[in-house]
Amino acid sequence: MSLVVQCPICQSSVPWTDDAKFKPFCSERCKLIDLGDWASEKHVIPVKSPFEAGLLDPDLLDDAGFEQDDFFKE
């Protein structure tokens, strides 16, 4: 007995087998719909920006022991 999953786009049953060409999708159409959703940014992975306000504050760099020219020394 093989595992059966739901297609993320149309919710039809998809057997999880080696010959399931588009798994977890039921068809190329559903796979391309999902790809288009990612390309148009309907789906995103939330991340914290490394450049949030205050992280590059010169006073914080001074507190960390960095001098202005430390970044360019050889």
From Swiss-Prot:
Keywords: Metal-binding, Zinc. The keyword Transferase does not apply. One of its GO terms (molecular function) is DNA topoisomerase type II (double strand cut, ATP-hydrolyzing) inhibitor activity. The keyword Zinc applies. Coiled coil: none annotated. GO terms for biological process: regulation of DNA-templated transcription. Binds 1 zinc ion. Its cofactor is Zn(2+). Zn(2+) binds at residues 7, 10, 26, 30. Pfam families: YacG. Belongs to the DNA gyrase inhibitor YacG family. Interacts with GyrB. Inhibits all the catalytic activities of DNA gyrase by preventing its interaction with DNA. Acts by binding directly to the C-terminal domain of GyrB, which probably disrupts DNA binding by the gyrase. This is DNA gyrase inhibitor YacG.
